[in-house]
Curated annotation (Swiss-Prot):
Chain's gene name: rplR
Organism: Geobacillus thermodenitrificans (strain NG80-2)
UniProt-recorded name of the protein: Large ribosomal subunit protein uL18
GO molecular function: 5S rRNA binding; structural constituent of ribosome
Function as written in the Swiss-Prot or TrEMBL entry: This is one of the proteins that bind and probably mediate the attachment of the 5S RNA into the large ribosomal subunit, where it forms part of the central protuberance.
Stored InterPro entries: Ribosomal_uL18_bac-type, Ribosomal_uL18_bac/euk
Domain of life where this protein originates: Bacteria
Length: 120
């Protein structure tokens, strides 16, 4: 019998492997990305304190696009999270793609955050 592959379970296993290697500090926190079917979320996390420093998503009140699940929305979230991080004095981060392929919405968010001033 052939079993169907659960893509989200595979992603979670991949993310667990990645998280063993990626660790955010106060000087260089972790930029974590979560992607759902309708929205995209980004958090800047200090793993030493286990605290979220900055976050942005397509659910924010500042978000003004009609569609929340496309590349344009991801770019807007990347710009928002970078702007908020720079306001808090964070310039360098470690990028955590969350087990997703570095393509499409994840890549668009990362590129927009880089263009807005974050270094990774």
């Amino acid at each position: 019998m052939i079993t169907k592959v659960d893509r989200n379970a595979v992603r979670k296993k991949r993310h667990a492997r990645i998280r063993k290697k990626i660790f955010g500090t106060a000087e260089r926190p972790r930029l974590s990305v979560f992607r759902s079917n309708k929205h995209i979320y980004a958090q800047i996390i200090d793993d030493v304190k286990s605290a979220t420093i900055v976050s942005a998503s397509t659910l924010d009140k500042e978000f003004s696009l009609d569609s929340t699940n496309n590349i344009d929305a991801a770019k807007k979230v990347g710009e928002l999270v970078a702007k908020r991080a720079l306001e808090k004095g964070i310039k360098q981060v470690v990028f955590d793609r969350g087990g997703y392929l570095y393509h499409g919405r994840v890549k668009a968010l990362a590129d927009a955050a880089r263009e807005a001033g974050l270094e990774f």
